[in-house]
Amino acid sequence: DPPFAPRM
C-alpha cells in the first residue's frame, strides 16, 4: 500500500 493511503 502507498504511504498516503493508509489501510483501514
UniProtKB/Swiss-Prot annotation:
Subcellular location(s) of the protein: Secreted
Principal place of residence: secreted
Residues modified to Methionine amide: M8
Protein keywords: Amidation, Neuropeptide, Secreted
One GO-annotated biological process of the protein: neuropeptide signaling pathway
GO cellular component, one term: extracellular region
Domain of life of the source: Eukaryota
Purpose of the protein: Myoactive.
Protein family according to the UniProt entry: Belongs to the pyrokinin family.
Protein name: Pyrokinin-3
